[in-house]
Amino acid sequence: MTHDQIMLVQGATTTSNSMVHEDAQARESAHANNHADNRSGYDVILVGAGIAGSALATSLARAGRRVLVLERDMSEPDRIVGELLQPGGVRALQLLGLEDALDGIDAVPAEGYDIFLSPREHVKIQYPHMAELPTRYGRSEPLGPDMHYAGRSFHHGRFIMALRSRMQAQPNVSVVEAAVTSLVHDLRDRRVVGVRTATSDVYHAPVTIVADGIFSKFRKEYGGAYKPEIRSHFVGIELPPDSVLTPKHGHVILNQKAAKRVAPGKSVGPALVYQIGSDATRLLVDVPGPVLPSV
């Protein structure tokens, strides 16, 4: 990694060594360098222990790096996102040696989608078999013994805790439950040299990776000029496990009549249905608009 770049990868921000900041921030760095609680001895500091942070911390530790992970809340999250992992995501876990994170969390195989325009108009789309990939899609997937290209759906929180468990099992990973409030910059060349927490603890490492999710507090400062535009919100509820029409499939339910009634340039999003375990099925409804309506 060069020292003059910022890299955004699926919500993770990697900060390196040539950030130009105001003198006030440089003065803060000088103060931090003399802080009584300074901590060092790490190769990488990782802010956030979600899917990206936990998986990356485990991989870096297995490669011999000394990793410090700072996460504001290590309890099991209760969220309605990140519940259906596509086949490519399953293969990525295999590449990282983390496919066993899908074991023991009551995950449901996902073999494709059933898309509905009306109760009588629907089409089933199956994920391809491995042998079909070269001829149909121009590539192959050599990973794993299973010849079926399948995803998994699950409770998001259970998957997060499984990834965290594997991360914490690495002897060279240290986990601190703390909120990171700022990045620390060197006074001389203003590179990022660590982080400061809400309790004023300061930790140092040559590389700092911020993976604190879609609502990252550091995105405005380090993410460039791009600002995500919110077009809609998902509203979710849990249904009984037998609510799915086609087992082991995600369901996309379109509303043709509603789509005809909306104003030009706007559209009504779909409803998504998929089983997330032997105990529940998830229903997500896309609500258009930048602000979620009050209930």
Predicted regions and their residues:
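Intrinsically disordered, low-complexity repeat/linker tracts enriched for polar/charged residues
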Residues: 3, 21, 25-27, 31, ...
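Beta1/beta-strand and adjacent pyrophosphate-binding region of the FAD-binding site
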Residues: 37-50
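Conserved N-terminal helical subregion
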Residues: 40-41, 91, 100-102, 109-221, ...
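Glycine-rich FAD pyrophosphate-binding loop
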Residues: 47, 61-81
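N-terminal Rossmann-fold NAD(P) dinucleotide-binding loop
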Residues: 53-54
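Conserved N-terminal glycine-rich FAD pyrophosphate-binding loop of Rossmann-like flavoproteins
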Residues: 74-94
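Conserved FAD-binding catalytic core of PHBH/FMO-like flavoproteins
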Residues: 212-295
